[in-house]
UniProtKB/Swiss-Prot annotation:
Protein residues bound to ATP: 94-104
Pfam family, one: GHMP_kinases_N
Protein function: Catalyzes the phosphorylation of the position 2 hydroxy group of 4-diphosphocytidyl-2C-methyl-D-erythritol.
Name of the featured protein: 4-diphosphocytidyl-2-C-methyl-D-erythritol kinase
Enzyme class: transferase
Cross-referenced SUPFAM superfamilies: GHMP Kinase, C-terminal domain (SSF55060), Ribosomal protein S5 domain 2-like (SSF54211)
Species assigned in the record: Bordetella parapertussis (strain 12822 / ATCC BAA-587 / NCTC 13253)
EC number per UniProt: 2.7.1.148
Length: 299
């Protein structure tokens, strides 16, 4: 087969603790990753000329900075293959929202081209290629819900119960580097264990240490959190934001909450005495047990 159309799922950080900082400036984290069925779609078609062609545009992202292109070229260098690919991308995951869209696209590129080109790298080999592309890329190659430590490379699979999520996107762009460099960021959270996390397994476990910084710096995000709480929805930020999520036991409950919030927003928009901050409901999504392409890699 010479072409694939494959998904690149979003991730949520169910909690995110900053427990320290290395001498090189990288932060030491503890977090739990879960994939959801909100996903980008990538199209790969083999080329015999060795070129990597990008059949899409990402606003503000040059081809040399595109993680998809970088992932493809990294795999070429590592394997010595002379094959190339024409790559298409349909974005559904909000860019820069803390949902790992770019990282997921890069991981799907490594997985799909490893199969398309027949380069035969193992999961651990692909994960070694993934880490230089970004701290979140390895977990998508790992392919399971995971408890992560270090800078994101120390991953342990965890079994999570079924759950659904409503994802909210505030009208704010949050630069990750600025949040991690903020002097008010707490960097000494007490470490937790996997057992601590698995004993509770609720959306109330721990916290996101980046969230207070984002709420202080971005009124669009703090306003969305406040408005949603006032209307019965308790949310948490994923990653460095700005996207927020609420957890539900089942997808129908998440869909119902989405419909109720949408109706309330519609009424508020028509009534001058009621306002709500700018945000959109991205999608009611199901939590996944594993990455859709997990079985494409030899362990």
């Amino acid at each position: 087969m010479t072409l694939y159309d494959v998904p690149a799922p979003a991730k949520l950080n169910l909690f995110l603790h900053v427990v320290g900082r290395r001498a090189d400036g990288y932060h030491l984290l503890q977090t739990a990753f879960r994939f959801i069925d909100l996903a980008d779609t990538l199209h790969f078609e083999a080329r015999a000329d060795g070129a990597i062609g990008r059949a899409y545009e990402l606003p503000g992202v040059a081809e040399s900075d595109d993680l998809v292109v970088r992932a493809a070229r990294s795999l070429q260098r590592a394997t010595g293959t002379r094959q190339g690919a024409q790559i298409g991308l349909h974005k559904r995951i909000p860019q820069g929202g803390g949902l790992g869209g770019g990282s997921s696209d890069a991981a799907t590129t490594l997985i799909a081209l490893n199969r398309l080109w027949g380069t035969g790298l193992s999961r651990s080999q692909l994960m070694q290629l993934a880490l230089p592309l970004g701290a979140d890329v390895p977990v998508f190659v790992f392919g399971q819900s995971a408890f992560a430590q270090g800078v994101g490379e120390d991953l342990t699979a965890v079994a999570l119960p079924p759950a659904a999520y409503l994802v909210v996107q505030p009208d704010a762009g949050v630069p990750t580097a600025a949040i991690f460099s903020d002097p008010d960021l707490t960097r000494d959270c007490a470490s937790v264990t996997i057992a601590d996390f698995l004993a509770l397994l609720t959306s109330c476990f721990g916290r996101n240490d980046l969230e207070p910084v984002v709420l202080r710096r971005y009124p669009e995000v703090s306003g969305a959190v406040r408005w949603l709480f006032e209307h019965g929805l308790r949310v948490r930020m994923s990653g460095s934001g700005a996207c927020l999520f609420a957890e539900f036991p089942t997808l129908p409950e998440a869909v119902l909450a989405q419909e109720e919030i949408t109706a309330t927003m519609r009424v508020a928009g028509k009534t001058t005495s009621h306002t709500h901050p700018g945000f959109r409901l991205v999608q009611a999504s199901t939590g996944l047990t594993e990455h859709p392409l997990r079985n494409w890699i030899a362990s």
